[in-house]
Amino acid sequence: MFVSFEGIDGCGKSTQVNLLVNYLEEKGIPYIKVREPGGTHLGEKIRELLITQEMCARSELLLFLASRAQLVESVIKPALKNGKIVIADRFAHSSVAYQGCGRELGPETVKILNDFATDKTYPDIVFYIDVPVNVAMERMKNQHKDRIEKEGKEFWESIRNCYLKMAKENENFVIIDGTRTIEEIHREIVKVFNAYL
């Protein structure tokens, strides 16, 4: 089974990824955890470029796609073949939202490129943790921000709206109210996850 977590920066996604991983550890369920961009030697090098270097929107998208293609071929496909659960802190839907909508490259264009980069390998469940943009920005205000996290409210609103549209169009999306407590969110995720097992 392949599970990804999505949401705008500051939604609490990475916290929930780690809590689900802890749950799998406790239950003795074999898994691997990956992140995007990253998860491979090449992917981590690309991550560093994406976070620190100024670049045009198309270059940004193509770097994310290169990282994703390597991650799918060298980590995700082998793990799924070996019966492990893959837990991804972001995956292809992030590019649709961030580059397709936020950078205005077009969600349909990004979807086509994602199909190529992932060899049409997609999550069985997408936990989309939804929070209003002002809540996410408040959570991020005291953090060191990378190049993308420094974007303004309009950018984040565009991304959130794109995620909500994808959630309506994809039955494997599970919308999680990210304004609740960490524990409440985790309980809901575990309940949904166990129903899929």
Curated annotation (Swiss-Prot):
<dbReference type="GO" id="GO:0006227">
    <property type="term" value="P:dUDP biosynthetic process"/>
</dbReference>
<keyword id="KW-0808">Transferase</keyword>
<feature type="binding site">
    <location>
        <begin position="7"/>
        <end position="14"/>
    </location>
    <ligand>
        <name>ATP</name>
    </ligand>
</feature>
<dbReference type="InterPro" id="IPR018094">
    <property type="entry name" value="Thymidylate_kinase"/>
</dbReference>
<keyword id="KW-0547">Nucleotide-binding</keyword>
<dbReference type="GO" id="GO:0005829">
    <property type="term" value="C:cytosol"/>
</dbReference>
<comment type="function">
    <text>Phosphorylation of dTMP to form dTDP in both de novo and salvage pathways of dTTP synthesis.</text>
</comment>
<dbReference type="Pfam" id="PF02223">
    <property type="entry name" value="Thymidylate_kin"/>
</dbReference>
<dbReference type="InterPro" id="IPR039430">
    <property type="entry name" value="Thymidylate_kin-like_dom"/>
</dbReference>
<dbReference type="GO" id="GO:0006235">
    <property type="term" value="P:dTTP biosynthetic process"/>
</dbReference>
<keyword id="KW-0418">Kinase</keyword>
<dbReference type="GO" id="GO:0004798">
    <property type="term" value="F:dTMP kinase activity"/>
</dbReference>
<keyword id="KW-0545">Nucleotide biosynthesis</keyword>
<dbReference type="GO" id="GO:0006233">
    <property type="term" value="P:dTDP biosynthetic process"/>
</dbReference>
<comment type="similarity">
    <text>Belongs to the thymidylate kinase family.</text>
</comment>
<dbReference type="GO" id="GO:0005524">
    <property type="term" value="F:ATP binding"/>
</dbReference>
<dbReference type="InterPro" id="IPR027417">
    <property type="entry name" value="P-loop_NTPase"/>
</dbReference>
<keyword id="KW-0067">ATP-binding</keyword>
<protein>
    <recommendedName>
        <fullName>Thymidylate kinase</fullName>
        <ecNumber>2.7.4.9</ecNumber>
    </recommendedName>
</protein>
